[in-house]
């Protein structure tokens, strides 16, 4: 029979279960284990259990998708009816088997089990023969059946038959071997290896022997094979051990095998020596003798190995559970076992190498011809995505995840066993299952005697959790003798039931027994969560060095974690691929043919001293990996290892908690305990255990309750609800009384202790006073005082130590730059030469210029012409030369673009000026100021900007304000759609460029790795300058993306270019020589540099880079289009000296007014909260602060209260303004940092000493990098008394992130501004006594030297001068440590040993106090702009920046990171004239002589000249009324002066609704603006009406009005004359607006609208003949009175002899008169009204009057209606006179509604383009402007029509808009307003509404 025959069970994994509770039953599990042809099916395990696992020493044969069957012989299927393929048993979980597939059982099939007909399962695609189907009468649920035991004589519904021939015939031609370097799969060897070898098989069973086997013998064979399959040892026999001693240790991975000696283990199955073939050593194959097994090391014999008990629990399965299936195997009689008849027992060379987490479920067998497999096989890991643990833990999991079984039984202590089984190793046994000891046959056993196993042995290991079987205690298996010394069996059926207890009574007996057994045997093995396992194999350094000899590279990266040092191991393959986990290594080995390197040669443990070690360190350039030297590696490994736990003491170990057993199928629910007793009694034990106050009465009560529960369970009694409630109530009352008594006792004790402590405090104080009075008296009374003094001294030392520790902590933290006293001076930067503007204005200029360079092309600017330079912009803002025009043109274009997009805000969309929308008004230099003012008002800009523009134009504004306005427009344009689209395009190009750069970098990295491998040089040396700082992230991303591309080459189509490049690089690496690789690297380096520059240019093009700030808070900028680095001063961040003094005085008053009693209470609370704090910790992290301990951020509460004037508020942990101590003299540099070994502050005593050591090392490191801290620490040789104090030479300003003081010569100055939080270690201040002087803040402000420990504060830059406590009382500090108060609250604290604080802390404290003081920033550093043009200056700046400065640290980082780019920027050529100081004096003179009134006067005078020019133009065009001439020019007068018309009210032209409100300014005759207004008004009135057009003169809007002119007083008749005139609404608005003009821009708007309304083309000078198209012969040219067309009299048909008199109309006008109706042209001029009559117009030559070219303009017109002499407008106006009063009121109401705040949606008609769907919903739209036009035209005949239109407006609003919308709300408001006003005016007309 071949060795594979025994493998007929298939397992697909175990269900995930916690290691502490064992395996739980899974609903997806398959059939039972010992079913004929039924495999065990388990769901997939989690992380390291991929696929199959070894259960009971069995491994699987086929893949997880196939199932194994046991192919039985034909006679076995017909001789016994017990073979039922559908009968299943649970062998592992102590529960019943799962229901069979028989439909007669009415049970569901397992969800994950696919059965074939007959209950068979295919193995590798082969389906076995059909079994005999089970009948419905065979019940498969053992829980419902009778109990079955071995040898009980009871007929079993299930039997077991076994035939060795079946096993021999199962797999006749299959043999599995390991591929040496191939992928993790298996192949069938062409040469079979049955038994020990294919050529040697000395005891193959014959056919006749197997056919004549007795049924009992068959059972014995099957049981023996089962034991062989479940056995845990390798094949071990006397012959094998004698011939090859090295076979006595066949451990997996080289680990020591667990061997039970003869006196420690008794086999439960005794083999039959008569059939044994292991006695003959000749059966050993030659190959086995020559082939080393598993390890080439010398193997020790079994006798020399220490006995280690092997766990029988597999992933939490204990021994009792493993034998459950054997108990469930019913046999007819006593089994007679001939175990050695099974041929597999002698298969000594079959070893399963299947790892625990292998995903392939077929076993691997080692052929004698296959090479040895060392350690952990490459085939171990096939699942790479399931391992989520860390690398160091993964290695342990992979080597420890296989558990080993215990021996099934253990011998009695005093009875040596006589036989011991030689368990055969099944070919399916995994390495974890093949590590049990090989036993020997005792000489006492007769070689011909068989030793059947008594049945009590099997009963003794029956699972206790099975309800059908009695629970057998494990003690029976430990004490019951198995065989007699003579080897004869002694069956004792009664002995098997001596320790049986019902399973329902104690369900957890088996786990308890398992825990006891593990406690007794677990001392010699490594214990894990899943059971007892052997010690894992750790790869040796020699093995780990092997890959390094074949081109691999191993790196260990060490960095400081949150609590300790952490290490991470990386492997780099020969191709440069980085691997951080075992799955990556295994995949790499499987994909690449790597000789001599396998999985066991790798170790990811960072404690393995192999490879290169790197440590992450903080350098001036940032965090960097620094390679460690060989001397540093052992200390780092020790730091990584850390504190290892003490080995487990099993003698004192507590018993494991019993895991909860999950209820199986069919089991009744667990009885709930609260149902047996009342809830109060049931909860009482838990509550008492929680309170930990179990008294004797409570224990007795708990015992009584348990007894009652047991009695109720037995009797099944139940109480009535009434009795239960009464009983519960009584118990509850008793319990509550007891709890109250307990609480009272505890409270009384606490009060007593508190009173005692207070009395003790008072006593100590009293005694101290008495001691001070009587110093010379000594006696018994002084002893308590001495004790208290010692206590206080201990407390003072503790507080001093904590304070000093906090000071050391703060000395390491970044702090405000102006608080540091050891600065190096910054280099002097060059100020911008031609800069005249202020700092803020120049900042806005930079913004404007950079914006125009970036987006000017998008906005339509010509970058070469339209974009001004900084010099031109500065001159224009200063109104110098022609630059002003360029700035005004820039303003016009920017404002025009802003009005277009983004436009006005939504609430200002209807804003109009002179009836025109702002976006439609043509912008010019003259009127842009008024449009700009309206735009700023719409965006709610500050009123000062808008008010200044009311009376003064833009060019008269100050330069800083003009620059701010232009910057505002730029910021608004940044939100426009066109700019956003441009930014998106740029970002897309940046992303594409970055992707290309990553691809090139990936190729370059691979080539460098290959070159480094070939040349032997490290890869770091080959990196050029482009691989320096700031590239870690891109490199990492590139590696990750390249790894993804390798795994998904076929699917990833977007990275084809990257894959092509990678393949080309690999080809070059494999086939190219070193020169070729260098050429490729050089080529790719150039491409990388190109992409980096392009990326940098693209990314910098759209933004200005802020590099950071220095100690003076100056900002460093890099601009895309300007050369150099710009440095901007911080203006406005300083506080005036008067404010500082005022704040300081108020602070002093608050502190000094604090009552002493409040301070005493604060002291007691402080010291009491710190009484339990230990003095120090010698190792580990510092303890966390207790809730009562003082936090540094609470130390400045008093200052915060004074600053915010909220002394009653609690302190929040957010950053608050903080106080600084006064300036201290700066100390001179000292010569050294470290003290000698014998110094008072030597290391090793406390946390104070460790902190001092850490501080000194940090200082040394900092000085070594920057040499900036030479004066940071003082040594005893350079104490404060020996050094000369000198004031600091670097003056700085306090940081807004921290509280600072600006010291003066006489006291501290304070600056309160926004702060950044300061984190520090907790440091309670020393207690202060009441009777001793406590200078508090006065001490800090005095001139006393602050070199004592009590004057320091651990939180920088926080001053330890006040402390916020729950009471809100400030805590004062003592000035001297010797003057501290003494308090007894430190009783019980351990006394600090060692020397008192050394001078070191006093010196550090003195240095720290100097850091608490922020120096003021020099005024010359606060304002202005500098620039850096020299790269050498940049280098000097880098060296001068302080590494502890909170700002300069970040600045140093950015300057170092972008140093190359910044040097290029500094070397760019200059293109702006502002950097050339040629015209600087002229500009400065212009700034000094700047006067807004002069600029405004110049603008007003220019407007007056433009009005005069317009008058001349009208007269020259002959468009004026006949007889009017231009007045004398006023612009040449010398008496003109400037007069500003300040607005009396906030009235505004476009905001107040057609200008009907506000006062009219009084005009003066010597003001140019007033003269321009008056002359322009006269010009409008004297322009001929027929030469006007829209927008001022619309023909359909013309109305005729009358006015009464009274005669002068001197006239004899006091009569008045009535005149009539024509006017339009727009003309009226224009006139009102002109009256209220206060600026030149407003006048220009009115003048521009009038100019656009004049029909210049109708001028007489431009009239041509309709026939000949010529304009000559003016004396013969007739002008039409209707359209001003002309015609020569000789060209007219019929021909005229002379010019006719009167009106003449051309043919075009005559044809239009006939077709049009009179109603369509209501406002036609009088002279044309004759054409509107019903009779035809004829002009007889004799009757009609003629006129010449110089016709009289004032000739009367022919009346249209001779009968009444009234025109239709006059009649309509006459008919409306009766309703004049009503309509007047309507006009008033309409005017009020238009000026209402909520009327903005109804002022103008709704634009259907903007509001889609409005016309579909609203059929009759109406608005206020339409109502006004109708009202002015006389369209309303009654007030009811007006009211109907008003209500129509509101009804339309309610119909179209939601009520809760803005427009809907406005509609409701306006409706209520209209109704209220209408009711007031029309009390009696409510019915008309």
Curated annotation (Swiss-Prot):
Which segments carry the region annotation Required for TTF1 binding? 332-726
PTM summary: Ubiquitinated. Deubiquitinated by USP21 leading to its stabilization.
Which residues, as ranges, make up the DNA-binding region of this protein?
Answer: 641-653, 662-674, 1176-1188, 1390-1402
Q: Where is the Bromo domain?
A: 1777-1881
Residues with the modification Phosphoserine, per the entry, are: 501, 605, 1042, 1174, 1374, 1377, 1383, 1545, 1733, 1755, 1767
Q: Which residues form a coiled coil?
A: 686-813
In terms of SMART domains, this protein maps to: AT_hook (SM00384), BROMO (SM00297), DDT (SM00571), MBD (SM00391), PHD (SM00249)
Which family, according to UniProt? Answer: Belongs to the WAL family.
What protein name does the entry list?
Bromodomain adjacent to zinc finger domain protein 2A
